[in-house]
Amino acid sequence: MRNIKLTISYKGTAYAGWQFQKNAHSIEEALLDAIHQVTGEVVKLYGAGRTDAGVHAQGQVANFTTASRIPPERFALALNTKLPRDIRVMESHQVPEDFHSRYSAVGKIYAYTLYTAPIESPFYWDYTWHIREVLDLRAMDTAARAFCGEHDFRGFMSTGSAVKSTVRRIDTLTIEDHSPEIQLTIQGNGFLYNMVRIITGTLVAVGMGKIKAEDIPGIIESGDREQGGITAPAQGLMLKKVIYSQ
């Protein structure tokens, strides 16, 4: 048996998220079906992150074990002939038996894109959060720095997931102005459920003047979800990269 690592890009608009669901289309289901068509095997697929409905990925990672004799690097081409156009395997490699896409990861990079203009673009609505107001990017940048470092982010998670600890480390959080698009890029050692989207919603609230940048440390310390901003819409979020030590 060989352990195969896949690097996957997908547009999440038409899917109910990564995880397999009985009554809805998922990214995992599409990949499992493609693997079955190519190998004739029913496998278990392990994803690095369970992206929600509407969330996209440029660098999602998954792995599975197979007895197939297909060369590891050829899996990408073979699977892409069976996948819908909005899902593509960008790379495939054989990895050590103990590699696990989720548990071997040491960090992730996410990007969130805002579209700041009076009128929403018909071309970018499914990749961005449309914001009509002019945002104070300087205040947002100040607030972003307060999120960096190791903190208890219990106030920046949605209910619905059980975790042993709500402490996470954010290594970098940057805001780039490509008007009318504004991109937030966040790298950390792990993220709680909806953590990136809630941080984004909070930074947008700072940009609108609804929350003061200097209040962010206190909001983090409080652990009170009600003090933060809204959960930003799913469609602006993209999993850019999963980081491994080797």
Language-model features and meaning:
Residues M1-Q246:
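Structured-RNA-binding interfaces characteristic of tRNA pseudouridine synthases
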